[in-house]
Amino acid sequence: VLERLGKQTYPHFEIIIADSKSKDHTKEVSLKHGATWLEDPSRNRADACNFALRQMDHDLVLFTDDDTIPPLDWVEKTVRWFENPEVGAVGGPNFAPDEDSWGSKCADVSFCTRFMTAGTRYGAQPKGELVPITHNPGVNCAHRMANLREVDFFEPGCIGAEDVVLDAKIQRAGHKIFIDPSNVMPHRRRKPFVPFMKQMRNYGYTRMIANRRWPEIATWSHTAIGFFPLIVVASILSMVLGLVASDFSLFPSMGPAR
């Protein structure tokens, strides 16, 4: 990620790493690539971002993750939209890169389809050049620093869905959020099944907590998908009861012996 950020077509920007007690030589790698390394005492992404943001003095802030492959024109394609004063924040879709495994690309479906994510799609690609949207995932988005300061940055202590809550705060303050469908960020997915299922469990849990505190980020589809496990159990029970009621047997009688 740092290597590709260092080769961007946009000439002047600062790369900042908020390092929360990592054990993988993050400091050495960051300094090697000319990034600003901050030793962060936080224990979650929201607080880590706030720790870094409060030490920054820039007009625009771009966010991405350490498991992405930033296109070399990503910064340039993102910041150009802020020439329009109506743009409070802008982002783009993200998909599994071409070199990811078949299993990871299957997992990509869970992030990029409306049905599987209750309407919150990481891979949303609406038609148009710059399209209004209610949320951009934190892996590929940018905000005006003035707006971030106005809403007091991320919600402190938010253990998940912090990017969703931030976008809600930004819009509550009267600012508009857009998506550039062409500005795609390749984003590696966790491999099925155990790592991916753990991630999905955590997403569901944290989104449920966020929905209760910020009702405006919840939609009917979030509530509906919560009934999915009950529907599955009810379907299985109905099938079993139906088989019992119909005297179904795996070993049907062959009739009386002659």
Predicted regions and their residues:
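Basic/Trp-rich segment in TM-proximal cytosolic loops or flexible interdomain/linker regions
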Residues: 193-257
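A conserved acidic beta->alpha catalytic loop
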Residues: 19-27, 68-69
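A recurrent flexible, glycine/aromatic-enriched loop bordering the glycosyltransferase active site
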Residues: 117-142, 158-159, 165, 185, ...
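Catalytic donor/gating beta->alpha subdomain of glycosyltransferases that bind UDP-sugars
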Residues: 82, 98, 149, 155-218
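Conserved donor NDP-sugar-binding/catalytic core segment of glycosyltransferases
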Residues: 72-105, 109
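Glycine-rich, basic loop-to-helix element that forms the pyrophosphate-binding segment
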Residues: 29-32, 40-56, 77, 131
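Short, acidic, metal-binding catalytic loop of nucleotide-sugar glycosyltransferases
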Residues: 3-12
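Short aromatic/hydrophobic "clamp" motif used to bind/position activated sugar donors
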Residues: 61
